[in-house]
Amino acid sequence: MDSVHPGGLGGTYGGNPVATAAALAVFEAVEEDGLLEKARRIEQVIREHFEQNADDRIAEVRGRGAMMAIEFVDPATGEPDATLTATVAAAVRAAGVILLTCGTYGNVVRFLPPLTIGEDLLKEGLSEVTKALQSA
């Protein structure tokens, strides 16, 4: 390609040098701060927590990196349990931890902690989920 034909490049922000520099800075920060490794560790901590605190109302712990989720079901039927999910989420919010509920049936709690979260704080938040589940 020797040159771009008229109308061949579009978009107000396409190839913007400032946006390109910002993207490069983000990639450098991800590498320098070890954020990929931190995401992997967050996943490991969440999975280990729910393995150690198994509950038959948790159908699945899923996700990758820092974006994880747990799915709640009625253990007798295997049906999604949106009521339990809402109860757990409300109790955890009352304890000061922000959780998002989601899923087609409203029976999933999603975790998306910042990559910079300290492990102690992450474990404290997960403990609140376990306490809420045990009292539900």
State what each model feature region is.
Residues M1-A136:
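Conserved N-terminal phosphate-binding loop of PLP-dependent enzymes in the Aspartate aminotransferase
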